[in-house]
From Swiss-Prot:
Lumenal side of membrane: 39-344
Name of the protein: Beta-1,4-galactosyltransferase 4
Tissue occurrence: Highest expression is observed in placenta, pancreas, kidney and heart. Expressed in corneal epithelial cells.
Organism, as annotated: Homo sapiens (Human)
Family affiliation: Belongs to the glycosyltransferase 7 family.
Domain of life: Eukaryota
Known regulation of activity: Up-regulated by LALBA.
Length: 344
């Protein structure tokens, strides 16, 4: 009886001891787990913060990239620029260099300029026929670039240079300028510009209108009066479509004179009117020069003028043959050099 009681107590004691040990082990393991978990909370917070920061940075980069690739749409420039000054006193420095003109026009690149603050209403190509008139070209570039920029134009200046050895053909050079310029840009408007004429008033807008426009109402050499009734030379403006419609200039005027009157007749044959600015606006200074060798008066000009109505469809842009020697994009202008075969 005593033995059984002792055994029974011993068994209960061992069972209790075993249970206590189990609870102790479980408690120890649980406490270690919670301590470890508590210690890991700051690390987890740091990880999540860094992850969130990376996510925000990633989104920011995406937004930045999208913003950089998205094209900003500018408003149209006003029909009358706020930068216009009106009549200007022109100064022609005898020691002017091309480097000076370039330094004065830092925003012109490869002969092109467009306003940054608005979208220009027209893309305008200025075509200047040229041979052996370097000083005149410098004076024109010095004054014409700021003049055009104040008018908020998207423009390019093309100087079409005739290679030596042939009689000068201004009209054919202008046909070449039109054809070659359109290979670079779908220009809206073309200004056919003599190298020795410099505009005095920037309200004389170098834009195209519903009808062809004659810009030289007067010049200093004629007392600022129109040279003669019907005069259509010096500086004229025709849209891409207008010039194409008249088949451009005739290619047959070798030497000086007649090609401007020929163009006027072509315009009139298409029942287009000619507009001009007000006399006080369409004023130009002609830089003095003597007649160039190779640009003598064309003795055939009157005979050619009598043929315009018969030949204008076949003589012009449609028949303009030439050898393209080079196209050079200088800082202030695009130089196009061509060679003609005399009589072609």
């Amino acid at each position: 009886m005593g033995f059984n009681l002792t055994f029974h107590l011993s068994y209960k004691f061992r069972l209790l001891l075993l249970l206590t040990l189990c609870l102790t082990v479980v408690g120890w393991a649980t406490s270690n787990y919670f301590v470890g978990a508590i210690q890991e909370i700051p690390k987890a917070k740091e990880f999540m913060a860094n992850f969130h920061k990376t996510l925000i940075l990633g989104k920011g980069k995406t937004l930045t990239n999208e913003a950089s690739t998205k094209k900003v749409e500018l408003d149209n420039c006003p029909s009358v620029s706020p930068y216009l000054r009106g009549q200007s006193k022109l100064i022609f420095k005898p020691d002017l260099t091309l480097e000076e003109v370039q330094a004065e026009n830092p925003k012109v690149s490869r002969g092109r300029y467009r306003p940054q603050e608005c979208k220009a209403l027209q893309r305008v190509a200025i075509l200047v026929p040229h041979r052996n008139r370097e000083k005149h070209l410098m004076y024109l570039l010095e004054h014409l670039h700021p003049f055009l920029q104040r008018q908020q134009l998207d423009y390019g200046i093309y100087v079409i240079h005739q290679a030596e050895g042939k009689k000068f053909n201004r009209a054919k050079l202008l046909n070449v300028g039109y054809l070659e310029a359109l290979k670079e840009e779908n220009w809206d408007c073309f200004i056919f510009h003599d190298v020795d004429l410099v505009p005095e008033n920037d309200f004389n807008l170098y834009k195209c209108e519903e009808h062809p426009k004659h810009l030289v109402v007067g010049r200093n050499s004629t007392g600022y009066r129109l040279r003669y009734s019907g005069y259509f030379g010096g500086v004229t403006a025709l849209s891409r479509e207008q010039f194409f419609k008249v088949n451009g200039f005739s290619n047959n005027y070798w030497g000086w004179g007649g090609e401007d009157d020929d163009l006027r007749l072509r315009v009139e044959l298409q029942r287009m009117k000619i507009s001009r600015p007000l006399p006080e606006v369409g004023k130009y200074t002609m830089v003095f020069h003597t007649r160039d060798k190779g640009n003598e008066v064309n003795a055939e000009r009157m005979k050619l003028l009598h043929q315009v109505s018969r030949v204008w469809r076949t003589d012009g842009l449609s028949s303009c043959s030439y050898k393209l020697v080079s196209v050079e994009h200088n800082p202030l202008y695009i130089n196009i050099t061509v060679d003609f075969w005399f009589g072609a």
